[in-house]
A protein has these predicted regions:
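Soluble or luminal CAZymes and related metallo-dependent hydrolases
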Residues: 5, 14, 44, 80-84
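Short loop/turn positions at the edges of beta-strands in beta-sheet-rich folds
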Residues: 14-16, 29, 96
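Active-site loop/oxyanion-hole signature of alpha/beta-hydrolase fold enzymes
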Residues: 63-103
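Alpha-helical elements of Rossmann-like donor-binding domains used by nucleotide-donor carbohydrate transfer enzymes
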Residues: 8, 47, 51, 83-90
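Structural motif
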Residues: 5, 27, 54-55, 92-95
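Small/polar loops that bind or transfer phosphate-bearing groups
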Residues: 14, 40, 104
Length: 105
């Protein structure tokens, strides 16, 4: 059985001494870069609608993550958009990805 938003395991990746929680599932063989989701300020992975993320995961790989210091990630929460963007880029690189399409609101 394929993973879904609710069944994909929450994994941890360490970046600069802090632990970032993320979930990754979906169609990794689509030939397209993964969709990397950025949640609203201090929101967590579970704030996304599973109907939407699972619908998108049918055609693309989906990656959700918790910002530094939010939900299941450790560290001090960032207060500047620039710092949050830097963290997202570092997590993307730590996951071994050179390209993603970003989804956010």
């Amino acid at each position: 059985m394929a993973d879904t938003h609710l069944t994909a395991p929450t994994r941890i990746i360490e970046v600069e001494g802090d632990r970032f929680a993320y979930r990754r599932w979906g169609n990794s063989g689509s030939g397209q870069p993964p969709l990397f989701f950025l949640q609203h300020f201090r929101g967590g992975m579970d704030h996304w609608d599973p109907l939407m993320t699972d619908g998108l995961a049918a055609g693309r790989e989906v990656i959700l993550y918790d910002y530094r210091g939010c939900a299941s990630s450790t560290g001090v929460p960032r207060t500047l958009i620039e710092d949050m963007a830097d963290d997202a880029a570092k997590v993307i690189r730590a996951l071994g990805l050179s390209r993603v399409d970003v989804v956010g609101f």
